[in-house]
């Protein structure tokens, strides 16, 4: 994973395929930490693997879900990553932490959103239902 970060220093965009490999490894680490309480479903058809994405976008989305939700044996966190209408769609069930939210460092969802607006004049769209949080990120084809 560290090699991926070092490689990113020179790149504004990476292939979606590389990003998916990275987020899969990151999710493997989280599964070691949380066990069966951390569930992921990554379903991106091969035809999208050549699209481009800002580095670490998916890792930030997963990290955001873990940061804001309870993950334990009585409350599993389910995260799905898929494609819909030229967007990557990241969804997670909601089970918000009851404690005060951590102070934002500006390196998470807000930072990714700013990068997409500045570089591509595209918005990262977020939404929430009673049961899930959804993020839509425009694919750079």
Predicted regions and their residues:
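Two-component histidine phosphotransfer core
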Residues: 1-138
């Amino acid at each position: 994973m560290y090699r991926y970060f070092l490689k990113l220093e020179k790149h504004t965009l990476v292939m979606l395929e590389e990003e998916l490999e990275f987020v899969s490894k990151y999710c493997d680490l989280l599964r070691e930490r949380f066990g069966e309480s951390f569930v992921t479903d990554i379903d991106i058809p091969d035809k999208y693997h050549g699209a481009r994405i800002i580095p670490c976008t998916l890792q930030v989305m997963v990290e955001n879900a873990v940061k804001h939700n309870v993950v334990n044996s009585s409350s599993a966190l389910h995260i799905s990553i898929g494609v819909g209408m030229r967007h990557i769609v990241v969804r997670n069930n909601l089970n918000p932490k009851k404690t005060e939210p951590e102070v934002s460092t500006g390196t998470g969802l807000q930072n990714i959103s700013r990068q997409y607006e500045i570089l591509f004049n595209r918005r990262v769209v977020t939404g929430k239902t009673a049961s899930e949080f959804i993020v839509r990120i425009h694919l750079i084809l």
